């Protein structure tokens, strides 16, 4: 039972780190990255659809993205979705593809993006700590119910603390990498 609690906590913490990593890919860095369009939705036959499912996105140059819709009829819808998103980019339509040039970020904008990245990292760490707290509560309940001895529970709590510290460090590392990426000119 103790192993199940620790395993479940570790699985959930791994998922949280992955979610944080995914969340950070949506922050614009000044370099072309197809992942920045992950959250952009366009109306496709009346259904909001991610533009990443409606087109192929390639990076021909470090600061340019090419978006080639699978159906030419969806070109205008994708263009409008990108314009209306909060990415701060303006696509140009040449009839075949959309070209999106990524403008250089200003120093002030970079600092705002770093703050945003740190906030997302903090959200990830809070989620990990909440998972730890839930695991600790489950361990204490096991001990209270008499299903596990005090020594076993204390050892499991130490293990859970160690695992938690490792995952918090992973989130810090992911955020630090993103911060470094953002501050590169």
From Swiss-Prot:
- InterPro entries, sorted: Ribosome_recyc_fac, Ribosome_recyc_fac_dom, RRF_sf
Source species, domain of life: Bacteria
- Say yes or no: keyword Chaperone present: no
User: Which GO terms fall under molecular function for this chain's record?
Assistant: ribosomal large subunit binding
* Tagged with keyword Cytoplasm: yes
Q: Name one GO biological process term.
A: translational termination
Alphabetically sorted, this entry's keywords are:
Cytoplasm, Protein biosynthesis
- Where, per UniProt, does this protein localize? Cytoplasm
Q: What's one GO-annotated cellular component?
A: cytoplasm
A single Pfam family, by name? RRF
Q: Describe the task this protein carries out.
A: Responsible for the release of ribosomes from messenger RNA at the termination of protein biosynthesis. May increase the efficiency of translation by recycling ribosomes from one round of translation to another.
Which family does the record assign? Belongs to the RRF family.
Which protein are we looking at?
Ribosome-recycling factor
In its UniProt entry, the species of origin is given as: Corynebacterium glutamicum (strain R)
Encoding gene per record: frr
């Amino acid at each position: 039972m103790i192993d199940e609690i620790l395993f479940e906590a570790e699985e959930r913490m791994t998922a949280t780190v992955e979610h944080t990593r995914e969340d950070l890919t949506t922050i614009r860095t000044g370099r072309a990255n197809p992942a920045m369009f992950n959250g952009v939705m366009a109306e496709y036959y009346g259904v909001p659809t991610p533009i990443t499912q409606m087109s192929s996105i390639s990076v021909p140059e470090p600061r340019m993205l090419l978006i080639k819709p699978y159906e030419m009829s969806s070109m205008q819808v994708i263009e409008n979705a990108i314009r209306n998103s909060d990415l701060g980019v303006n696509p140009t339509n040449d009839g075949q593809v959309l070209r999106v040039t990524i403008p250089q970020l200003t120093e002030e904008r970079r600092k705002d993006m770093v703050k945003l990245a740190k906030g997302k990292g903090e959200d990830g760490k809070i989620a990990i700590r909440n998972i730890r707290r839930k695991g600790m509560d489950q361990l204490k309940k096991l001990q209270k119910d008499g299903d596990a001895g005090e020594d076993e529970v204390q050892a499991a709590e130490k293990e859970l603390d160690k695992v938690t510290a490792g995952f918090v460090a992973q989130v810090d590392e992911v955020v630090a990498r993103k911060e470094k990426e953002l501050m590169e000119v």
